């Protein structure tokens, strides 16, 4: 997968392509529907699949105090795009220059690429102040011999699948429902930190991850059925998110995972913990 991080570098990609456009901050089923539609069209016409998105949430510039917690780290997002078969990722910083482009100026810059089709969700907007919409894209497509595919929003019964809805589910600990909307288990990745190592003393060695709750979505305090991935292997386990009430003097919130059928040393190693179901709230053991 080729990654371009600047509008000024778009000219370096010269192959015919189909572009899916969106914030794609959660890569949930709605986002996958847009990208999947673009992929299908690209395959049918022998063209490359391109995705245009932002490396930072637009609100980080417009209203920093309202920036939502992330559902994916940049590394996770790139891995997901690659797994979906994206050939070209346009991962563009949302900065003042981009925010001030009119819809027409944005499309003019995008027009450097040789695309035959644009694919968006029905609520897509772009350009300064979000002035560009489906009508804008329709007029552009008609005037530039380009196909426009507009995908309807994807719903779970009466609920529209959205990153906001998924954030609420994760915050409430409803990771099973979030898993359905995402089309995958919600996961956290990080380096195992060295804790007090008391788990070893009571016969249940654990891996600990410090949580940056201000930056990435963290499930509510409780115990979860999880799967743990590292070194190309997968293990089942039980994860506890909370303030470690068993050891009352420990105040920092962490994810503590008991990995079944594993007794190795994971300190300083990178692991990914996928959440499948909330078992119960956090309980202090006497």
Regions found by a protein language model. Name each.
Residues 28, 81, 118, 178, ...:
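Residue-level signal for inorganic ion chemistry
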Residues 69-77, 99-107:
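Glycine-rich, highly charged phosphate/nucleotide-binding loops
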Residues 100-205:
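Classical nucleotidyltransferase
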Residues 2-9:
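Short acidic-hydrophobic, aromatic-tinged amphipathic segments that line or gate anion-handling sites
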Residues 10-73:
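N-terminal catalytic cores of NTP/NDP-binding nucleotidyl/phosphoryl-transfer enzymes
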Residues 73-90:
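A glycine-rich helix N-cap at a beta->alpha junction
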């Amino acid at each position: 997968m080729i990654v371009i991080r600047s509008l000024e570098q778009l000219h370096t990609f010269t192959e015919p392509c189909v572009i899916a456009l969106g914030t794609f901050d959660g890569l949930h089923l709605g986002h996958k529907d847009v990208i999947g539609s673009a992929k299908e069209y690209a395959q049918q016409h022998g063209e490359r699949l391109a995705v245009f998105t932002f490396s930072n949430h637009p609100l980080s510039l417009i209203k920093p105090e309202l920036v939502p917690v992330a559902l994916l780290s940049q590394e996770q997002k790139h891995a997901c795009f690659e797994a979906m078969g994206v050939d070209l990722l346009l991962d563009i910083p949302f900065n003042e220059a981009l925010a001030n482009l009119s819809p027409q100026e944005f499309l003019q810059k995008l027009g450097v690429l040789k695309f035959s089709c644009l694919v968006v969700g029905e609520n897509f907007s772009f350009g300064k102040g979000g002035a560009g919409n489906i009508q804008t894209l329709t007029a552009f497509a008609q005037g530039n011999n380009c196909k426009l595919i507009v995908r309807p929003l994807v719903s779970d019964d009466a609920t529209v699948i959205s990153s906001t809805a998924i954030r609420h589910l994760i915050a409430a600990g409803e990771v099973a429902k979030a898993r359905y909307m995402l089309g995958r288990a919600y996961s956290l990745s990080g380096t195992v930190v060295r804790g007090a190592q008391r788990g070893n003393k009571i016969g249940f060695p654990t891996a600990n991850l410090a949580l940056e709750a201000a930056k990435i979505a963290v499930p509510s305090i409780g115990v979860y059925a999880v799967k743990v991935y590292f070194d190309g292997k997968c293990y089942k386990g039980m994860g506890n998110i909370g303030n470690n009430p068993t050891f009352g003097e420990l105040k920092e919130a962490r994810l503590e995972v008991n990995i079944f059928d594993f007794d190795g040393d994971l300190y300083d190693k990178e692991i990914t913990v996928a959440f499948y179901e909330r078992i119960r709230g956090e309980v202090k053991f006497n």
